[in-house]
Amino acid sequence: LVKVKELPYENVTTKSHDGLKLSARLYLKDPNAPFDILAHGYKSNSIKDFSGGINLSLENGHNVLLIDQRAHGDSEGHTISFGILERFDILSWINYLNSRFTDKIQISLIGISMGGATVLMASELDLPSNVKLVIADCPFSSATDIITKVTIENNYPIRLLKIFLPVSAKLLGGFDINASSA
């Protein structure tokens, strides 16, 4: 296995639908080959989550876009929405690839944990026809479900969560916590 940090790549950026700078590493083998967009999990990073998976993609002749989800790594943002806003970021990356290369390339969306939920939520959107595959490894079903699970595991009062979660998501994060589910 080749170490991910030793592979040549290009730092690339795009803008999210709400104006944030999103960052990624582009591992380009052949501009006409399929592209895999890899989305990491909550408070993680793509190099850690895909240290083995990137090799599989590259060995199969695919190009890889290793993204930093919003509020992670080099991407801007302060709020993690558990896939609700991040799904639109996936669409921004698809549009980036289609405009830089061509909309004839085949694109796969691959995510782990929150990244898995993100790519599943993105699949609800009106994606271009060149998105051919979505793979979600151990996603959660919804933002509310995962937050409730963590709240219970940490013995926090669940009644307060049900009251404050929707309000704080809207006021602090600008999103509806129930807007989408994987």
Question: Whereabouts are the PLM-identified features?
Answer:
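Alpha/beta-hydrolase active-site loop
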Residues: I80-F101
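Serine-hydrolase catalytic core
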Residues: E6, V12-S16, R25, A169-A182
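Conserved alpha/beta-hydrolase
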Residues: S57-E76
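Hydrolase active-site cap/lid region
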Residues: M121-A179
